[in-house]
Amino acid sequence: MIEPFILFGEQHIETLTYTFGIIVLICLISNFISTSLQNIVTKIIGISLLGFEILRPFLYIFVFEKPWETYLPLHMCAFSAFLIGIFLLSKSRNQMFFELPYYWGVGGATMALATPDLTLGWPDVEYFFFFYGHGQILLGVFFALTVLKYRPHLQNFWRMAVITILLLIPVSYTHLRAHETPI
């Protein structure tokens, strides 16, 4: 039987420890391998990010019979995963494809991992998908920071802020229109 998820319970703390440990280990080891091996690891992380984000909604909807409205990849963490995955797979890397996941993903994925909205613990598939998906975002961003040596540029912060606001306006409007507000 699958136990209920307990926020900051033993299972949650262990999963966080493993997640962050794997991220640190991959980033550290990748700094001591050849450039050709770094390129292979970069591609593997990028393919894993994109593959997981593309397959996840289909798995939830068609295999686990979850409601499609809930599992469409229309949130900032999914956008972050797509962007950092594309960034890692591109030959000419677009700085904004690094910076948007840096600002959205690090804060969002860290907060999501620290305070997940889960009802069941391991070995529930949603538990695995949640920690794997958000952990990958952090891995992609920290790999770009520590191994590929990319850094966010302060002059691009305002562009990132405008893109964020433009993405949030329709989402907020749609959310407000979808729910009846009390008079």
Residue spans of the language-model regions?
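Aromatic-anchored segments of alpha-helical transmembrane domains
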Residues: L49-F58, G105-P116, I165-Y173
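Membrane-interface helix-boundary motifs at transmembrane edges
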Residues: F32-T42, S90-F97, L148-F157
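Hydrophobic transmembrane alpha-helical segments in integral membrane proteins
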Residues: M1-I22
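Alpha-helical transmembrane segments in multipass membrane proteins, preferentially the mid-helix core
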Residues: I84, I137-H153
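Membrane-interface helix caps and helix-loop-helix hairpins in membrane proteins
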Residues: I61-W68, S92-N94, P116-F128
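A glycine-rich, hydrophobic loop/mini-helix early in the fold
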Residues: K43-L88
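Membrane-embedded alpha-helical segments of multi-pass membrane proteins
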Residues: T17-G21, P73-L83, P101, F131-L139
